Curated annotation (Swiss-Prot):
Protein name stated in the entry: Acetyl-coenzyme A carboxylase carboxyl transferase subunit alpha
Family statement drawn from the similarity comment of this UniProt entry: Belongs to the AccA family.
Record HAMAP family: AcetylCoA_CT_alpha (MF_00823)
Catalytic reaction annotation: N(6)-carboxybiotinyl-L-lysyl-[protein] + acetyl-CoA = N(6)-biotinyl-L-lysyl-[protein] + malonyl-CoA
Record organism: Rubrobacter xylanophilus (strain DSM 9941 / JCM 11954 / NBRC 16129 / PRD-1)
Keywords: ATP-binding, Cytoplasm, Fatty acid biosynthesis, Fatty acid metabolism, Lipid biosynthesis, Lipid metabolism, Nucleotide-binding, Transferase
Metabolic or biological pathway, per its Swiss-Prot or TrEMBL entry: Lipid metabolism; malonyl-CoA biosynthesis; malonyl-CoA from acetyl-CoA: step 1/1
InterPro entries reported in the protein's UniProt record: Acetyl_CoA_COase_a_su, ClpP/crotonase-like_dom_sf, COA_CT_C
Function per UniProt: Component of the acetyl coenzyme A carboxylase (ACC) complex. First, biotin carboxylase catalyzes the carboxylation of biotin on its carrier protein (BCCP) and then the CO(2) group is transferred by the carboxyltransferase to acetyl-CoA to form malonyl-CoA.
Subcellular localization(s) per the UniProt record: Cytoplasm
Superkingdom assignment: Bacteria
GO terms of molecular function: acetyl-CoA carboxylase activity; ATP binding; carboxyl- or carbamoyltransferase activity
Length: 320
């Protein structure tokens, strides 16, 4: 339970207790109805006024649907491919040939795992160089077979351990970016949770970038930013505000194409609704780009990223 969800949790527990007692007393239904209305109002009040850092906390929620949940719900078929053909495999990133709502694609995603064992195996979604080299290999296969690339991004960032650095972490990510910039097929990306730094960027340099409304995309985690800038990690909420890392901030700045709605209370409250929203977006976007020629795709992709980072001059303070 997140700290700001405590009032919601208390109401839920009170309602559950009254439901338990309702069999013994018939005079509790009115109180249950009143508390259920209060619960709905509390959810709406809290979740329509989340701060940027609270959205980061929601994006990290352990019960939030992960890559496996989306894969299992959206894919009619999925044939996983493993290994980078250089060093080994990396369970933090999974990908392969898939069929999503009748359309053949190459599906790639960060895998945070579903239980303790799989989370440790997948390093909590923090990929090593071999993971990013596997991703590049999958981009190449998509180009060879003319299949759209679909990526589901959910990572705190690329793993920064000594072994990863020795095996060329930064190089592997840069190779992914180069491959994505030039791959002659549609690239559709959705950030479903965390979008941490280069580890996320290696999979979201796309023709379409969507974000679930409580996901984030940032060059650095708020806690790390606060430690560096303020010398105080407890100022993470302040750092999150300054980083402009929320889906709505990034949509406003032209980085993100669409903010996908989550159920009230976050994706972890109703995973099926969140997965359905992502599935509908993927179906719509893939249908829209399916007829594009490689030349048009690359031209639009280039123009898209040239626009990001542009600025406008604002009038200065009046001299009067």
């Amino acid at each position: 339970m997140l700290d700001f969800e405590r009032p919601i949790k208390e109401l839920e527990e009170r309602i559950a207790e009254l439901h338990r007692l309702a069999g013994e007393s018939e005079g509790l239904q009115a109180e249950i109805s009143r508390l259920e209305e209060a619960l709905e109002a509390a959810r709406r009040r809290i979740y329509t006024n989340l701060s940027p850092y609270q959205r980061v906390q929601v994006a990290r929620h352990p019960e939030r649907p992960n890559f496996r949940a989306y894969r299992d719900a959206l894919c009619e078929d999925f044939y996983e491919l493993s290994g980078d053909r250089h060093y080994g495999d990396d369970a933090a990133v999974r990908g392969g040939f898939a069929r999503i709502r009748g359309r053949n694609v190459v599906l790639i995603g960060h895998d945070k795992g579903a239980d303790v064992k799989s989370r440790v195996e997948g390093n909590f979604g923090m990929a090593h160089p071999e993971g990013y080299r596997k991703v590049k290999r999958l981009y190449g296969l998509a180009a060879r077979f003319g299949l759209p690339v679909v990526t589901l991004v959910d990572t705190p960032g690329a793993f920064a351990g000594r072994g990863a650095e020795e095996r060329g972490q930064a190089w592997a990510i840069s190779e992914d970016l180069m491959a994505l910039a030039a791959v002659p097929v549609p690239v559709v990306s959705v950030i479903i949770g965390e979008g941490g730094s280069g580890g996320a960027l290696a999979m979201c340099l796309a023709d379409y970038l969507g974000m679930l409304e409580n996901s984030y995309l940032s060059v650095i985690a708020p806690e790390a930013c606060a430690s560096i800038i303020f010398r105080d990690s407890s100022r993470a909420p302040e750092a999150a505000e300054a980083l402009k890392l929320t889906a709505r901030d990034l949509k406003e700045h032209g980085v993100v194409d669409e903010v996908l709605p989550e159920p009230l209370g976050g994706a972890h409250r109703d995973p099926e609704a969140a997965i359905r929203a992502v599935g509908e977006a993927l179906e719509r976007v893939l249908a829209g780009v399916s007829g594009s020629s490689p030349e048009d795709l690359l031209k639009r992709r280039y123009a898209r990223y040239r626009r990001i980072g542009s600025y406008q001059r604002l009038p200065g303070p009046s001299s009067g």
